[in-house]
Amino acid sequence: MKPENKLPVLDLISAEMKTVVNTLQPDLPSWPATGTIAEQRQYYTLERRFWNAGAPEMATRAYMVPTKYGQVETRLFCPQPDSPATLFYLHGGGFILGNLDTHDRIMRLLASYSQCTVIGIDYPLSPEARFPQAIEEIVAACCYFHQQAEDYQINMSRIGFAGDSAGAMLALASALWLRDKQIDCGKIAGVLLWYGLYGLRDSVTRRLLGGVWDGLTQQDLQMYEEAYLSNDADRESPYYCLFNNDLTREVPPCFIAGAEFDPLLDDSRLLYQTLAAHQQPCEFKLYPGTLHVFLHYSRMMKTADEALRDGAQFFTAQL
């Protein structure tokens, strides 16, 4: 679609979203558009420091977990000693960016609002790691903590997965992987999915929305996919195109959050409509006036804080 035909998104977003877009960080260098992935990752980490400030304090522990690929870093956020469940968090970043630091505030707030232990998994990034390595390492970490729950003093009898953007896909893919391969890591009480992508290759929102403001043009989305997948056949894998998986049975309760001006919004709508049509427990909520990645901006956006509270409330209601 010609850029001129797209919606004038920056004119339509909410006042608080505009405040975020217009917030300048004077000490921050320019985005290294032509730089290496390593430089872009470094910039992303620096840029997120401002948005992560002021998060709730709580007991935090870091552990390296063994997998067949090597060790993966994890970070445990423990808001109380008697947690009713454990929630695994997978960060967004198009499979190529992000880490436990870039999403620190999100995980702390989720732990605070749910009063559950949250474990962030620093899964391997692409293109160094190709599909399905990230999912396999997430599952390995889940199994490790299930086996060592007593040693780490965590409750693994009931678990959940949560993620934003690419992390939302990984969250649901990991839950389906455990179901399909009959791996016991505790009862999956719920899955929290903020503005994820789940397998659509084209849609109305992908045509009308997306630009330099969110890094989600059709060219951007193609680049993320090519970095993540090992080959063309992976596009149809039921753990990448999740609509090719069986969504008619034993899908854990899903909280599906959509951002109004997100090109990936139709992925969330289709996921909700598919699950609802087959009587799978799910809830969809649209957050008006928001862009993709709005969850990061709870320092300024009440809507971002609301979205985290909504997800936490949904999860605890399943326990």
Swiss-Prot record:
One of its GO terms (molecular function) is carboxylic ester hydrolase activity. It is found in: Cytoplasm. GO terms for cellular component: cytoplasm. The active site is at 165, 262, 292. Pfam families: Abhydrolase_3. A motif (Involved in the stabilization of the negatively charged intermediate by the formation of the oxyanion hole) lies at residues 91-93. Keywords: Cytoplasm, Hydrolase, Serine esterase. Displays esterase activity towards short chain fatty esters (acyl chain length of up to 8 carbons). Able to hydrolyze triacetylglycerol (triacetin) and tributyrylglycerol (tributyrin), but not trioleylglycerol (triolein) or cholesterol oleate. Negatively regulates MalT activity by antagonizing maltotriose binding. Inhibits MelA galactosidase activity. Belongs to the 'GDXG' lipolytic enzyme family. Homodimer. Interacts with MalT and MelA. This is Acetyl esterase.
